């Protein structure tokens, strides 16, 4: 059998096909090959056909392999088109039964690489279209229409060739015509795979050179070969026993750190779905694991490869006043593997910072290495600093690394290192008890989290104008949306926030932080102060004399200015109306909510005016229709925190009580602003 390879020289990644071809040629040997005979398919007798079971048995006996390996190799032979099925052409799998197969002619083997051009495929589709009278498969119809548009300029030639091949095929006998049709179909199934079928010949771009090509011997090539062998003779040779001993020692040293051989602590996140392993082994984790710190002592490359180890080593070098060595090494790594469009700028910066005479972080290297480096910087490239980087690397490895392992910094790091306990996988057969699977944390997300943490720390400033505010939480920080009285010791909620029908307060009521003092709301203080001015007596905030409720003050002030003929509005509606108007008339924008202090009440122009006396009151406004107003009077410690206020329903009772209720205006509002609100 004569086989000519016409296009394999530039496809070295397909070199394994030659081994398959050698095996296929042995299979076609008349004496030792696969048994072949004429087989009847439909109404045609096909010559040289064989069964899939015979092919599988021959591969097992010829190569001395298992049944599974032989099945896999047989599938490869069929998928690459060396054997094609007769009964099910689309199923390119070797069936170990009586299914019929046939050897492909060497002209259609993949190694021939005669170009499977669009013109040849168009001729094949046109011939099938003529033979099947327009009945093609869907993907063949799509390819036919696409090629008709693509090579429409020579479509007449395609139709003429298809008709000629169809007429020539009719002149052959029935068996040859059937065999040729099967061969063509098998070839195009491999080279123009249908949708959903794997294209086994998709190997990427063609290579320009062929590594298996026999090169012509020239004088230059012979000199290079002689030089190579001379250098090989000069190398120091090592016994195989010494090399194997080094490999065994390395394997024993790293066996405990091999996650596949020895497992990982606390557990493998891909098996147990526990992300604690990734959290404990983050790049710059605060406290590393003990196994990670112990690995730094294996060799210097393990230390400098780990970001956390490099950070600890940098801290040690700074104590020895030699931190510029590691800084120079990191700068060289950035030059080598960083953005190559900025090589020139980075090289100049490294020279000014580390190599120039009198540089701020000048490194100590020998004169010969310095001359080589400075000469190379005239035409900078990514490897221009390799000589200086190697010199500094060996200096740190032989001098600083040994002292680092004996330093208190490494010993303290090793003592503080954590050793996580092993966790077992929790499995459950119940679907609602299974844990949801999570993917591994993305490096992009981890980087974003680190940047957010740095930004959060940078933004955490201290307000020096408020002494003591940042040291502890405010002892009476509360959210007030209604009227409340001091709660009882047995309940964290105020009893006045409850109603007889509602034993528990709603979430929009008074909410107090646990274990803190009680802060009287500014509205209650104002109402108590106003009621005291009218003769009811000033109420104090204490447990012995809690004073009249706020609702009574509102009731009294409203009843005096209202005609007795009008019915009184409900208590809740009147309280909501007063609070709603209080919040809608710009009081929320007032500086009083920034910091309520008895020494600094707010005024209408938005500025803070200090008062000399605690009991000094603002001048009373005298509007025409105002019977009461809020006067902020707070008896609390000067270092107390702010009291927050919120409205339950700002719009409650707004439309129905406009005529029956008197306006309530804040003391920092003018009458015009109150009417405009």
Swiss-Prot record:
UniProt entry tagged with the keyword Membrane: yes
> Which region ranges are annotated with the description Disordered?
530-571, 639-677
Give the multimer and partner information: Heterodimer with GNB5. Interacts with RGS7BP, leading to regulate the subcellular location of the heterodimer formed with GNB5. Component of the RGS9-1-Gbeta5 complex composed of RGS9 (RGS9-1), Gbeta5 (GNB5) and RGS9BP. Interacts with PDE6G and GNAT1.
> In which organism is this protein found?
Rattus norvegicus
Q: Which SMART domains match?
A: DEP, G_gamma, GGL, RGS
Give the bilayer topology.
Peripheral membrane protein
Expression by tissue: Expressed in the central nervous system. Isoform RGS9L is found in striatum, hypothalamus and nucleus accumbens while isoform RGS9S is expressed in retina and pineal gland.
Protein name, entry field: Regulator of G-protein signaling 9
Keywords for this protein: Membrane, Sensory transduction, Signal transduction inhibitor, Vision
Q: Which residues form the DEP domain?
A: 30-105
Read off the InterPro entries from this record. DEP_dom (IPR000591), G-protein_gamma-like_dom (IPR015898), GGL_sf (IPR036284), RGS (IPR016137), RGS6/7/9/11 (IPR047016), RGS6/7/9/11_DHEX_sf (IPR047017), RGS9_RGS (IPR047077), RGS_DHEX (IPR040759)
Question: Lineage, please?
Answer: Eukaryota, Metazoa, Chordata, Craniata, Vertebrata
**What function does this protein fulfil?**
Inhibits signal transduction by increasing the GTPase activity of G protein alpha subunits thereby driving them into their inactive GDP-bound form. Binds to GNAT1. Involved in phototransduction; key element in the recovery phase of visual transduction.
Q: Where in the cell is it found?
A: Membrane
